[in-house]
């Protein structure tokens, strides 16, 4: 049967397409918007059956043009947390998602979709519960509102609906994201260009570089998506993070030490990296004050209860792999 991946040329979507290929799945319809044409590179090493622009997909899907569709991996969205055009964000992330959901429910198609930890905003608790959800920007609100729709629909749904609140995802195939690419990606490029990595200094009670996030490798994100794809009886909204909060210092230090290792140099401690000017702290920008999550950490209780028991990569493991991959692309 046919599989559909929206946002297929994007970061997570392309990784899902590649992972499906590795299972022998090639009857895949890739849906995206290639106005930014450089994203095509993410699909060059992938096998797909067809490509559709997102503007024509919804109508054709609702019309039944693709026959029996087993599953839709809905990864297509505007993920720019600094986007201020609320009308565009709601149309792209909320209305479009509702249209895809409605057809999946009507046709009995598995619906696996990208939600976001941005829903939690400045909360210090990260559980899939309404009372801790308070997005700080319109991107987070667009994801929040769609999750509320899912909560209302789930009790009567006859087919799978699985939403994943992605935390800070990093890994291969994110180059096109530009300023919205991961910290690991930017640290890598900055170190190669300038010989040092810059991190935010003290802010909101956190020491320089000690703001913490739940950084999760796209390898693990893909594995979780495929686990639920294999278990269509499992539905719900799930946090998708490692369950470990790690500081930005860990990302930067791992990037520096991996690049040093590739240059046959010995690893350094964080203190040594700072002392030698390999990591530099800069004042926290005014534009981000009040809009910045200083701490995120996924509560994995629901995910583990659903049966997903595989370990998640640490920053040291995942970023080391990623930096080596990036180095091979240069």
Curated annotation (Swiss-Prot):
Any idea what job this protein has?
A: Catalyzes the interconversion between ADP-D-glycero-beta-D-manno-heptose and ADP-L-glycero-beta-D-manno-heptose via an epimerization at carbon 6 of the heptose.
Cited Gene3D superfamilies: NAD(P)-binding Rossmann-like Domain, UDP-galactose 4-epimerase, domain 1
- Give the top-rank taxon of the lineage listed in the UniProt record for this protein: Bacteria
Q: Where does substrate bind?
A: 168, 179, 186, 200-203, 213, 292
The cofactor binding remark recorded in the entry reads: Binds 1 NADP(+) per subunit.
Q: Which residues bind NADP(+)?
A: 11-12, 32-33, 39, 54, 75-79, 92, 143, 169, 177
| Active site per UniProt | 139 (proton acceptor), 177 (proton acceptor)
Q: Which family does it belong to?
A: Belongs to the NAD(P)-dependent epimerase/dehydratase family. HldD subfamily.
Return the SUPFAM superfamilies for the record.
Answer: NAD(P)-binding Rossmann-fold domains
Q: Which GO terms describe its molecular function?
A: ADP-glyceromanno-heptose 6-epimerase activity; NADP binding
- What reaction(s) does this enzyme catalyze? ADP-D-glycero-beta-D-manno-heptose = ADP-L-glycero-beta-D-manno-heptose
Which pathway features in its UniProt record? Answer: Nucleotide-sugar biosynthesis; ADP-L-glycero-beta-D-manno-heptose biosynthesis; ADP-L-glycero-beta-D-manno-heptose from D-glycero-beta-D-manno-heptose 7-phosphate: step 4/4
Catalytic activity, EC: 5.1.3.20
Give cofactor(s), names only.
Answer: NADP(+)
This chain belongs to which protein, by name?
ADP-L-glycero-D-manno-heptose-6-epimerase
| Keywords annotated in UniProt | Carbohydrate metabolism, Isomerase, NADP
Q: What is known of its domains?
A: Contains a large N-terminal NADP-binding domain, and a smaller C-terminal substrate-binding domain.
Q: Which GO terms describe its biological process?
A: ADP-L-glycero-beta-D-manno-heptose biosynthetic process; carbohydrate metabolic process
């Amino acid at each position: 049967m046919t599989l559909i991946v929206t946002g297929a040329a994007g970061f997570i979507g392309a990784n899902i397409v590649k992972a499906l290929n590795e299972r022998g799945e090639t009857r895949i319809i890739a849906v995206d918007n290639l106005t930014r044409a450089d994203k095509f590179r993410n699909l060059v090493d992938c096998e797909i059956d067809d490509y559709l622009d997102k503007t024509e997909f919804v109508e054709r899907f609702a019309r039944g043009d693709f026959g029996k569709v087993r599953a839709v991996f809905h990864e297509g969205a505007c993920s720019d947390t600094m986007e201020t055009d609320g009308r565009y964000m709601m149309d792209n992330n909320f209305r479009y998602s509702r249209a895809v959901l409605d057809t999946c429910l009507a046709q009995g198609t598995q619906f696996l979709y990208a939600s976001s930890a941005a829903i939690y905003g400045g909360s210090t608790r990260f559980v899939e519960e309404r009372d801790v959800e308070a997005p700080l920007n319109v991107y987070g609100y667009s994801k929040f509102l769609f999750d509320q729709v899912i909560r209302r629909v789930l009790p009567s749904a006859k087919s799978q609906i699985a939403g994943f609140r992605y935390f800070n995802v990093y890994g291969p195939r994110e180059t096109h994201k530009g300023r919205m690419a991961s910290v690991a990606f930017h640290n890598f490029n900055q170190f190669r260009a300038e010989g040092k990595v810059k991190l935010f200094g003290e802010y909101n009670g956190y020491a320089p570089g000690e703001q913490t996030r739940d950084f999760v490798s796209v390898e693990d994100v893909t594995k979780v998506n495929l686990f639920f794809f294999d278990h269509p009886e499992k539905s719900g909204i799930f946090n998708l993070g490692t369950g470990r909060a790690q500081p930005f210092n860990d990302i930067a230090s791992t990037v520096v030490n991996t690049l040093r290792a590739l240059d046959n140099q010995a690893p350094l401690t964080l203190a040594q990296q700072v002392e030698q000017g390999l990591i530099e702290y800069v004042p926290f920008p005014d534009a981000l004050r009040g809009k910045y999550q200083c701490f995120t950490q996924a509560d994995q209780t629901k995910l583990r209860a659903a049966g997903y028991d595989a370990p998640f990569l640490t920053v040291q493991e995942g970023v080391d792999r990623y930096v080596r991959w990036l180095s091979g692309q240069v």
